[in-house]
């Protein structure tokens, strides 16, 4: 029987339509590709052939009218801001389709939190977005404090220091964006300048927290320790120098013809597109919408600080560059106000059932086992030692409930959904990372543009794959 051409099939008979032969139809044994995955043209239409195991090929056979090239960018590509894989379908130099592949940096951070105490979970979450670890710590600790009902009990000095270190971190993060973005566009001087100033910020954070990155400095109830001697002087020296550096960036890049040619009117995404995709942060503000959670939904007393929310209307890569530069200047204003507000006082809540020891000097090994620390724990009574042992090993209990807390990170809205079942460990911690959401905009930014502009588009979003994959 002659098979019908109305449905795909596998057969050893030639493909013909009922009552007539196929134009150019392949015959058995003629060595043609009719018996491989693909299609042939017949008088009644196109006939698809599947020989088994070739489904992936046949699914796209109908779209192969024109020649297409698929290019893999990453996951080891230096311009993908981490282990991000971009699968680009191109027609000449034009990108027709962009697909993102993530997950290469998954480390199970959220799941790991379920096997640690509420305080120990900070050491995992600070490693999610590794370019802004203090924001992960702050958002998580604010969530735990809401569940505990101690938000209003956090000492004023601890809250001010939290704002101080977060704004320092914002500057450091934007400087990494400037340096890596400059490197990807061939502006090596911008790379050198950006990392030069970032080193100064990391030196300040190391002075304050003991570590350059992954600080575990912000903890439920307050901070790990107070500011060491000389911190205020070092920060004020930085505040005096940094405005000159920002002006230097403007002189170097803002009017530079090649820099502008690569970024102006490139990777445009307007406010409506940002809202539809859930994009936040500098990308949204560069589209004209002044949405900044420090202003719209204040936390940590941000409503008492004076600063502006930089915006632009062009919604292109150059506008995102300008917004980030202006944000660094606004962060400097906030840091200066923090220094003026610092008053002596505790940096941890008074409730000893929650508070880990604070106000203690750190030993030479950085582990907090200085003589002052040991004397505070063991030099009082056996009951004090037992309490400390149980607090550290078992942790404190958090009442059952769930809470969602969002803050404004350097990349946008960073949200934490924290669930407690009444135990000493989190039942669930879910991170709404801005890089994960903002990456959804990359196809909208890049499709229809040039291959070279893909690098600009990804850089303008500024994703951190540690936060994306977690």
Swiss-Prot record:
Signal sequence, start to end: none
Sorted UniProt keywords: Cell membrane, Membrane, NAD, Quinone, Translocase, Transport
InterPro entries: NADH_Q_OxRdtase_suD, NDH1_su_D/H, NiFe-Hase_large
Protein family per UniProt: Belongs to the complex I 49 kDa subunit family.
PANTHER family per UniProt: NADH DEHYDROGENASE [UBIQUINONE] IRON-SULFUR PROTEIN 2, MITOCHONDRIAL, NADH-UBIQUINONE OXIDOREDUCTASE 49 KDA SUBUNIT
Name of this chain's protein: NADH-quinone oxidoreductase subunit D
Broad class of the protein's primary localization: membrane
Region (Disordered): 1-37
Catalysed reactions, semicolon-separated: a quinone + NADH + 5 H(+)(in) = a quinol + NAD(+) + 4 H(+)(out)
Superkingdom of origin organism: Bacteria
UniProt source species: Frankia alni (strain DSM 45986 / CECT 9034 / ACN14a)
Ranges of biased composition (kind: Low complexity): 1-18
Mode of membrane association: Peripheral membrane protein
Entry-linked SUPFAM superfamilies: HydB/Nqo4-like (SSF56762)
Keyword check for Nuclease: no
Record's subunit section: NDH-1 is composed of 14 different subunits. Subunits NuoB, C, D, E, F, and G constitute the peripheral sector of the complex.
């Amino acid at each position: 029987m002659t098979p019908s051409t109305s449905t795909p099939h596998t057969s050893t008979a030639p493909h013909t339509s009922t009552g007539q032969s196929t134009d150019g139809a392949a015959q058995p044994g003629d060595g043609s590709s009719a018996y491989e995955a693909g299609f042939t043209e017949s008088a009644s239409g196109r006939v698809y052939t599947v020989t088994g195991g070739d489904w992936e090929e046949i699914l796209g056979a109908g779209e192969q009218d024109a020649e297409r090239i698929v290019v893999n960018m990453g996951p080891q590509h230096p311009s993908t801001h981490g282990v991000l894989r971009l699968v680009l379908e191109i027609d000449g130099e034009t990108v027709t389709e962009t697909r993102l592949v993530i997950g290469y940096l998954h480390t199970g951070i959220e799941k790991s939190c379920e096997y640690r105490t509420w305080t120990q979970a900070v050491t995992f979450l600070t490693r999610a977005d590794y370019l802004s670890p203090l924001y992960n710590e702050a958002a998580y600790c604010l969530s735990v404090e809401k569940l505990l009902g101690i938000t209003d009990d956090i000492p004023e000095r601890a809250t001010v220091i939290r704002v101080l270190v977060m704004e320092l971190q914002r500057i450091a993060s934007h400087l990494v964006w400037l340096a890596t973005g400059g490197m990807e566009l061939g502006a090596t001087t911008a790379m050198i300048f950006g990392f030069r100033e970032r080193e100064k910020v990391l030196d300040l954070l190391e002075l304050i927290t003991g570590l350059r990155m992954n600080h575990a400095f912000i903890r439920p109830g307050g901070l790990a320790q107070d500011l060491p001697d000389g911190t205020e002087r070092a920060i004020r020296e930085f505040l005096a120098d940094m405005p000159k550096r920002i002006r230097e960036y403007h002189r170097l890049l803002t009017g530079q013809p090649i820099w502008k040619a690569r970024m102006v009117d490139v990777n445009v995404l307007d406010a409506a597109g940002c809202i539809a995709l859930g994009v936040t942060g500098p990308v949204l503000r560069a589209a004209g919408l002044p949405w900044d959670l420090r202003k719209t939904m204040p936390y940590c007393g941000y409503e008492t600080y004076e600063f502006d929310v930089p915006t632009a209307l062009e919604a292109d890569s150059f506008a995102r560059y300008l917004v980030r530069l202006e944000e660094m200047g606004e962060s400097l204003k906030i840091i200066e106000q923090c220094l003026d507000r610092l008053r002596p006082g505790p940096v941890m809540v008074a409730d000893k059932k929650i508070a880990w020891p604070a106000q203690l000097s750190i030993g030479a090994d950085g582990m907090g086992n200085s003589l002052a620390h040991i004397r505070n724990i063991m030099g009082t009574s056996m009951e004090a030692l037992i309490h400390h042992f149980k607090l550290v090993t078992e942790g404190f209990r958090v009442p059952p409930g769930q809470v969602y807390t969002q803050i404004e990170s350097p990349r946008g809205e960073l949200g934490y959904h924290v669930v407690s079942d009444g135990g000493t460990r989190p039942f669930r911690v879910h991170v709404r990372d801005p890089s994960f959401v903002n990456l959804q905009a990359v196809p909208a930014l890049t499709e229809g543009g040039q291959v070279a502009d893909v690098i600009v588009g990804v850089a303008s979003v500024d994703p951190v794959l540690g936060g994306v994959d977690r």
